[in-house]
């Protein structure tokens, strides 16, 4: 039940309409920073669990 190309295109079009061309780069930058922070947090959480088990 993944997203097809047409669904992805519609979602991107809606995002473009909501945020406009001027804000889109800032929104994407903030999203990328958030994803990076989430991944780093998950990586740190895994390291904490390894230390607790030893």
Swiss-Prot record:
Query: Could you give one GO CC term from the UniProt record?
Result: TAT protein transport complex
The record's principal subcellular location, in a coarse class, is: membrane
Q: Where in the cell is it found?
A: Cell inner membrane
How is this protein situated with respect to the membrane? Answer: Single-pass membrane protein
Molecular function as annotated in GO: protein transmembrane transporter activity
Entry keywords, A to Z: Cell inner membrane, Cell membrane, Membrane, Protein transport, Translocation, Transmembrane, Transmembrane helix, Transport
Q: Which family does it belong to?
A: Belongs to the TatA/E family.
BP term (GO), one: protein transport by the Tat complex
Q: How does it assemble?
A: The Tat system comprises two distinct complexes: a TatABC complex, containing multiple copies of TatA, TatB and TatC subunits, and a separate TatA complex, containing only TatA subunits. Substrates initially bind to the TatABC complex, which probably triggers association of the separate TatA complex to form the active translocon.
Primary role: Part of the twin-arginine translocation (Tat) system that transports large folded proteins containing a characteristic twin-arginine motif in their signal peptide across membranes. TatA could form the protein-conducting channel of the Tat system.
User: What protein name is recorded for this chain?
Assistant: Sec-independent protein translocase protein TatA
Q: What Pfam family is a match for this entry?
A: TatA_B_E
Q: Where are the transmembrane segments?
A: 1-21
The record ties this protein, via HAMAP family, to: TatA_E
* Listed InterPro entries: TatA/B/E, TatA/E
């Amino acid at each position: 039940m993944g997203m097809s190309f047409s669904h992805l295109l519609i979602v991107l079009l809606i995002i473009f309409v909501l945020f406009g061309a001027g804000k889109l780069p800032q929104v994407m930058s903030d999203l990328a920073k958030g994803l990076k922070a989430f991944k780093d947090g998950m990586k740190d959480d895994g390291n904490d669990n390894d230390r607790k088990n030893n």
